[in-house]
A protein has these predicted regions:
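Active-site-adjacent structural elements in enzyme catalytic cores
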Residues: 1-211
């Protein structure tokens, strides 16, 4: 049975978030709000938790997981970022964009793409997500909370509680989130490639839905 934390969306209570972080440190999976949709998250260094994350989400190791980072400085510790890529990142962070980049040695091989050695990274613009990351002191491993066999992310914390209370260790309820996943941009090759149109406007990066 999961623990349920109801927090203020702009000024989350530190006491409750500290309890959620303790659960993450202990290897638990949590459902948390972000600026795009609710996400399933776990501690980056916990192998068993990462396997559980994939199992709950219903994806294999070829599905890009995402690192939620506090800022671009932290992101650059986990991905190889050149000057051109950094300028693009600055245009769209923080915000509902996920960038696929080549992972550094700081990223465990088991959570990066098995053949490409890439990883999704983003800097969310949500007070609760940022507060959790600050308390944890490192990125969270994440995936959009889309139930297996479905195409839309979950938005209602009560529905998440009903459907996932036996699967996740913690649910952080900050009210409804947007129902769109992030816009995914692949920066691991020569130029930016729009992989998925989501909540973030690709025009910020000079891209269109036809790119």
């Amino acid at each position: 049975m999961s623990q349920y934390f109801e927090v203020h969306p702009q000024n989350p209570q530190p006491r409750l978030l500290k309890q959620a972080v303790q659960i993450l440190h202990g290897g638990g999976i949590a459902a948390i709000p972000t600026d795009s949709s609710y996400a399933l998250v776990c501690h980056l260094d916990d192998k068993a938790a990462a396997e559980s994350l994939r199992r709950i989400r219903g994806v294999d190791d070829k599905h890009h997981l995402t690192l939620l980072c506090r800022d671009l400085s932290e992101l650059a510790s986990y991905a190889r970022v050149d000057n051109k890529q950094y300028r693009l990142l600055k245009l769209a962070t923080p915000g509902p964009y996920t960038f696929i980049l080549e992972a550094t040695k700081e990223v465990p091989r088991r959570v990066s793409h098995p053949s490409r050695r890439t990883i999704g990274l983003r800097v969310p613009q949500h007070a609760v997500t940022q507060a959790l990351l600050e308390l944890l002191g490192q990125p969270l491993l994440a995936t959009t909370l889309i139930p297996p066999g479905e195409t839309e992310p979950l938005n209602d914390p009560q529905e998440i509680r009903e459907r996932f209370q036996k699967s996740v260790a913690a649910i952080v309820d900050a009210g409804a989130c947007p129902m769109q996943p992030t816009t995914v941009i692949d920066l691991s090759n020569d130029g930016p490639i729009l992989v998925r149109q989501g909540r973030g406007d690709p025009a910020v990066l000079g891209l269109s839905a036809d790119s």
